[in-house]
Design a protein with these regions (language model features):
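Hydrophobic pocket/interface hotspot
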Residues: 17-21, 27, 70, 108, ...
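Hydrophobic ligand-binding cavity/cleft-lining segments
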Residues: 1-48, 102
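Short, highly charged C-terminal tails/helix-capping segments
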Residues: 140-149
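Hydrophobic/aromatic beta-strand elements that line small-molecule binding cavities or substrate pockets
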Residues: 8, 37-39, 66-72, 92-99
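Beta-strand/loop substructures that line and gate deep hydrophobic ligand-binding cavities in soluble
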Residues: 82-129, 133
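Solvent-exposed residues in well-ordered beta-strands and their adjoining turns
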Residues: 9-13, 56-58, 71-73, 98-100, ...
């Protein structure tokens, strides 16, 4: 398994960042290696927003689709992503949001394992570099959309 966490202060309001993270259909516009994002079966209740989502990731002819269950818990300002289908054997991804003076402290945690042991080994070697690149893409996107820096 590969796991990592990132903690950053992002120059936008908490609700703006949460909305951006939940909008996976826009990920291809800014997330490296993301080709397509789709949302299915979206539900919105008083305390929870949830949906099933697909992310197609890769480069040129090498790509995979990951299906996940995404839930945003309004009371705790936490987004939890778990694996439904695709090349992952295991996925736990959490986003925690805390507003601090019109900025948002974002804590991101991911733990995953691919079904293919060879690909799993390759991913472990480049995982941290890729994760940092993706985290930077979210930060840049937030600044572009909300310009509070």
């Amino acid at each position: 398994m590969s796991s990592a966490s990132i903690k950053k202060i992002i120059p936008c309001k908490k609700n703006q960042l949460i909305e951006m993270v939940l909008d996976i259909e826009k990920y291809p516009e800014f997330v490296p290696w993301c080709i397509e994002g789709k949302i299915y079966e979206k539900k919105n209740s008083e305390d929870l927003i949830s949906f099933n989502g697909d992310l197609k990731v890769g480069k040129s002819i090498l790509n995979e689709t990951f299906s996940s269950y995404v839930s945003y818990h309004k009371e705790t300002d936490k987004i939890i992503v778990t694996n439904l289908n695709g090349p992952l054997k295991h996925l736990k991804n959490e986003w925690h949001f805390k507003e601090i003076n019109n900025n948002t402290q974002l804590e991101f945690f991911i733990d995953f394992e691919l079904k293919n042991p060879i690909l799993n080994g390759i991913m472990k070697k480049s995982f941290e570099l890729g994760l940092n690149k993706i985290a930077k893409a979210f930060e840049v996107r937030a600044v572009q959309l909300y310009k509070q820096c």
